[in-house]
């Protein structure tokens, strides 16, 4: 949990509001009470008074075990982080006049990236007068995409960017 979120949570004596809309430990609405009354009620059951909605008028406070509440929040954050998937974009560089063996080697590397779940940017850099024959580069990229069509989909068709032409491949969704 970030330090900002910790500092913003108002508990027990750190509550600044004079009146609070109080919710009991089992979730029932108790009503609007003064801060002093709410604190006494929380102390009677050996729990904390925690403000859960500070922007409401009056602020909403709940009688609960703050340690348990904090632990549950941290657990939820960890679950959210686990569900997030980081997608890397790996780049493979080819030339318009690439030989077959070199092409197969680059293809093998690209397939490895795609099976791991990474996206793959296949680019061709045109040097010198080779830029006049863009169709050769486009054929190489289309051949690459065709060889990977069983494990990848074309996310972006061949496109020129300065002296480079590239294609984006994304792994197909697993069933």
UniProtKB/Swiss-Prot annotation:
Localisation per UniProt entry: Cytoplasm
Disulfide bridge map: none
GO biological process: ribosome disassembly
Pfam families, sorted: IF3_C, IF3_N
InterPro entries recorded: T_IF-3_C_sf, T_IF-3_N_sf, Translation_initiation_fac3_CS, Translation_initiation_fac_3, Translation_initiation_fac_3_C, Translation_initiation_fac_3_N
GO cellular component, one term: cytosol
Family: Belongs to the IF-3 family.
Subunit structure, as described in the record: Monomer.
Protein name, UniProt field: Translation initiation factor IF-3
Native source species: Staphylococcus aureus (strain NCTC 8325 / PS 47)
